[in-house]
């Protein structure tokens, strides 16, 4: 591991609401199972430790390659080196899904930029369309 290990994970945490949402998705209320607060907190600590372990190993790998940026390949190798090779296919699938979502966001942003209108002008047009639709709705015979 790196010389720059964290002295304590006390200040590191994951959002409780996010962890609770994941737990709820895995254990739906219909299952009759519950997850105690202590169990949730322990799970959060384990997740932080896992992330710290993987990121530290990936950092070491990138440093050995004289890279300044940790890439997906470094994380993949860290998982393999630490004995978590079974996770790699799922991690790569999620990474690919994330890339696709980013591309979709970029396309949406560029469509707005390509319109040549400012956000203010687009908002004004939208309000005019709403006003027009409301007038048509109110004028329609009953």
Swiss-Prot record:
Q: One biological-process term from Gene Ontology?
A: negative regulation of transcription by RNA polymerase III
Please state which protein family the record places this protein in.
Belongs to the NC2 beta/DR1 family.
Assembly: Forms the NCT transcriptional regulatory complex with nctA and mot1.
Q: Which GO terms describe its molecular function?
A: chromatin binding; core promoter sequence-specific DNA binding; protein heterodimerization activity; RNA polymerase II general transcription initiation factor activity; TBP-class protein binding; transcription coactivator activity; transcription corepressor activity
What the entry lists under PANTHER family is as follows: PROTEIN DR1
SUPFAM superfamilies from the UniProt entry: Histone-fold (SSF47113)
Q: Gene3D superfamilies annotated for this entry?
A: Histone, subunit A
- Protein name listed in UniProt: NCT transcriptional regulatory complex subunit B
Disrupted gene: resulting phenotype?
A: Leads to a multidrug-resistance phenotype, including the azoles (itraconazole, voriconazole and posaconazole), as well as the salvage therapeutic amphotericin B and terbinafine, an agent used in the treatment of chronic and allergic disease. Also leads to transcriptional derepression of cdr1B and its over-production. Also results in a notable increase in the immunogenic properties of Aspergillus fumigatus, but does not result in loss of virulence.
Keywords recorded for this protein, A-Z = DNA-binding, Nucleus, Transcription, Transcription regulation
The record's section on InterPro entries has: CBFA_NFYB_domain (IPR003958), Histone-fold (IPR009072), Ncb2 (IPR042225)
Instruction: Reply yes or no: does the keyword Nucleus apply.
Output: yes
Function field: Part of the NCT transcriptional regulatory complex that acts as a key regulator of ergosterol biosynthesis and the azole exporter cdr1B. The NCT complex binds the promoters of genes linked to azole susceptibility, and especially represses the expression of cdr1B transporter.
Query: Where, if anywhere, are coiled coils annotated?
Result: none
Q: List cellular component terms (GO).
A: negative cofactor 2 complex
Q: Establish whether keyword Translocase is in the entry.
A: no
Q: Any idea where this protein resides?
A: Nucleus
């Amino acid at each position: 591991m790196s010389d720059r290990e964290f002295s304590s994970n006390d200040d590191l945490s994951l959002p409780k609401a996010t962890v609770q949402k994941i737990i709820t998705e895995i254990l739906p209320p219909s299952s009759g199972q519950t997850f105690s607060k202590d169990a949730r907190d322990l799970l959060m600590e384990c997740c932080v430790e896992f992330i710290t372990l993987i990121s530290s190993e990936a950092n070491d790998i990138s440093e050995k390659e004289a890279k300044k940026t940790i890439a997906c390949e470094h994380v993949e190798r860290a998982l393999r080196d630490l004995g978590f090779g079974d996770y790699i296919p799922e991690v790569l699938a999620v990474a690919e899904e994330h890339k696709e979502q980013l591309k979709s966001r970029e396309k949406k942003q560029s469509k707005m930029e390509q319109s040549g209108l400012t956000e203010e002008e687009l908002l004004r047009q939208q309000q005019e369309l709403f006003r027009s639709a409301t007038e048509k709705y109110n004028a329609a015979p009953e």
